[in-house]
């Protein structure tokens, strides 16, 4: 299935049906009085997060969603039928953004979460509603309220606990394949990964989700390479794993390139907890590993893990470090949502 994480959608709620002007006409009843029914309500447009979807590709082939209008009222106090609602089924993690591309209307992060995008118009009143002590036979009724036209953007941000960052060919997909059941495309050329991949990782009886996004290059924030369009998919992550190719002769420059792109992207991404790992040590001798690790630790100001995705060396240590950050972040969220007790 093709991956699509941004699309424009046009929606319209249904208008309300008009009220009915009608009078009761029966044999032997001279003054039957008004009996016009109300119009039906128009259908509303909703969005709902559902399980089993991980792309917005369906909205490429259908961008217009118009709910049906309510039926007009009828005589004998019969109310018109209401229009059916329309529900846009989107993946969990979808942001709904207004036409200005800035205002976030809703962020659907849980299965079953719903948001009303356009309310259907109310049905008009029939003439029965206007009967009074001074007007026994009203000949007026209300038209239904019109529906609402709206243009919105749907933007998918994958929900993962940890995000993989690095230059192209840093070994991100190999790491994901070695630590999870995910099977991303792996090859020895840049930009093998063209779309984000998710993998469920297990460590010490715990599970969490890792997102692998296409590699960044210098100038990605300005649109070079695949650009920074996929960085949105790691915005929700609790921790970032920065993989650096240990066989590169410019290992410190490679590290700083990614950090520079994170800072250029803006938001809180550059402030997220980061774990740095030097990959591909299976292709290095012990002296190279020691020298380049030392240089990288000097640049990062912290610990640098040494791993090999191909040989499986050092992977569990990195996974445990990731889990420690994720577990801490989950604990903080529980405290934030805990009800206050005296």
UniProtKB/Swiss-Prot annotation:
SUPFAM superfamilies: Obg GTP-binding protein N-terminal domain (SSF82051), P-loop containing nucleoside triphosphate hydrolases (SSF52540). Mg(2+) binds at residues 173, 193. Its cofactor is Mg(2+). Its EC number is 3.6.5.-. Residues 1-159 form the Obg domain. It is an enzyme of class 3 (hydrolase). GO terms for cellular component: cytoplasm. One of its GO terms (biological process) is ribosome biogenesis. It is found in: Cytoplasm. Keywords: Cytoplasm, GTP-binding, Hydrolase, Magnesium, Metal-binding, Nucleotide-binding. It holds the Pfam family GTP1_OBG. Monomer. An essential GTPase which binds GTP, GDP and possibly (p)ppGpp with moderate affinity, with high nucleotide exchange rates and a fairly low GTP hydrolysis rate. Plays a role in control of the cell cycle, stress response, ribosome biogenesis and in those bacteria that undergo differentiation, in morphogenesis control. This is GTPase Obg. The lineage of its organism: Bacteria, Pseudomonadati, Pseudomonadota, Alphaproteobacteria, Rhodobacterales. The gene is obg.
């Amino acid at each position: 299935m093709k991956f699509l994480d941004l699309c424009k959608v046009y929606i319209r709620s249904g208008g309300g049906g008009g009220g009915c002007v009608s009078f009761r006409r029966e044999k032997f009843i001279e003054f039957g009085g008004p009996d016009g029914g109300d119009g039906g309500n128009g259908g509303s447009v909703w969005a709902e997060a559902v399980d089993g979807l991980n792309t917005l590709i369906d909205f490429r082939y259908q961008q217009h969603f118009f709910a049906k209008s309510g039926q007009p009222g009828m005589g004998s106090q019969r109310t018109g039928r209401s229009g059916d609602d329309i529900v846009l089924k989107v993946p969990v993690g979808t942001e709904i953004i207004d036409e200005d591309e800035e205002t976030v209307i809703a962020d659907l992060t849980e299965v079953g979460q719903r948001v009303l995008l356009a309310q259907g118009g109310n049905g008009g009143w029939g003439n029965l509603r206007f009967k009074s002590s001074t007007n026994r036979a009203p000949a007026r009724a209300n038209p239904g309220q019109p529906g609402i036209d709206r243009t919105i953007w749907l933007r998918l941000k994958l929900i993962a606990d940890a995000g993989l960052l690095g230059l192209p060919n840093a070994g991100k997909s190999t790491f994901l394949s070695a630590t999870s059941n995910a099977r991303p495309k792996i090859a020895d050329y840049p930009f093998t990964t063209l779309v984000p991949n998710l993998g469920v990782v297990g460590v010490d009886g715990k599970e969490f989700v890792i997102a692998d996004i296409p590699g960044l290059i210098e100038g990605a924030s300005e649109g070079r390479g695949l650009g920074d369009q996929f960085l949105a998919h790691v915005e929700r992550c609790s921790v970032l794993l920065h993989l650096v190719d240990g066989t590169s002769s410019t290992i410190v420059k490679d590290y700083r390139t990614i950090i520079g792109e994170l800072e250029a992207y803006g938001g809180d991404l550059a402030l997220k907890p980061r774990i740095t790992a030097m990959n591909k040590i299976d292709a290095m001798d012990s002296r190279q590993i020691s020298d380049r690790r030392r240089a990288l630790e000097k640049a990062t100001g912290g610990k640098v893990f040494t791993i090999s995705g191909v040989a499986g060396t050092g992977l569990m240590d990195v996974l445990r470090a990731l889990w420690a950050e994720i577990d801490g972040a989950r604990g903080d969220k529980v405290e934030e949502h805990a009800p206050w007790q005296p």
